[in-house]
Amino acid sequence: MDKDSRIYVAGHRGMAGGAVCRALQAQGFRRIVTRTHAELDLCRQGEVERFFAEERPEYVFHCAARVGGIAANAEAPADFLYENMMLEMNVIHAAWRYGCRKLLFLGSSCIYPREAPQPMPERCLLSGPLEKSNEAYALAKISGLKYCAYLRQQYGADFISVMPTNLYGTGDSYHPAHSHVLPALIRRFHEAKAAGLPEVVCWGTGRALREFLYADDLAEACLFLMRSYSGEEPVNIGTGEELSIGELAEKIAHMVGFGGRIRWDSSKPDGTPRKLLDLTSLHALGWKARISLDEGLPLAYADFLNGPGRAER
């Protein structure tokens, strides 16, 4: 992949795709191809086929997805499964059909079994039942990953897959009903402080353990792997550090200046009890995350206050 390669970033308006575009631009890549949803509906196979036939991208970063937190996944599992399956299969198939030299597919750590060994190695994929709260999304992501693997197996396509941990950062969604836990907590504590509320109620017990990766670190890892990895196995991307959701809530409350009480509603689900990635493969390849959670949280809050995140407030 050189500076004049024609590179298509699917999902460039999302957090992950936007970070990949910024990383490509920062490293001097000059021919980055993007399309908005209005210009190209990735769920429509005919549109995707025409786009690839006309543009002929040499490299593809497949970052497009319909995403959401526990509530959003529970409310619309059929939509999550259908939309993600369609946009994944359409892009991956067209990339193969029209001679794309290499594709990177962005999976998710939620594809691992609910009771997977911790930290979770890549080999434990499909070794047990999925977490019910995001099963539809996970099934779609597994299908995309497997399609890349089968195209490699049957046709020799250099299509690789990565599994990032929970992401946050510039361009995240702060939608009150559909966002993931970290941006949801930023919004909730910010608004509670502004309104002078005495307490904030959070879902679950606060005991679930999670790992968080800043989106710009993910982008750097994706560019690194696009250049240096052509293996058959998917690769985990994370920080190797975890904390409880309760600890995360306390960090965010302190950051925004909320001094009230945090109350946990245990009638609401926690999701998977623990989710930490085994990064042995990634570290052996020579890449490690740079941005710690304590460094990344203020950047995410600044995005919520002044950046693209303002659009969903």
Model-derived segments and spans:
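N-terminal Rossmann/SDR dinucleotide-binding element
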Residues: 1-66
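Flexible, glycine-rich beta-alpha linker
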Residues: 111-113, 136, 160-184, 208-209
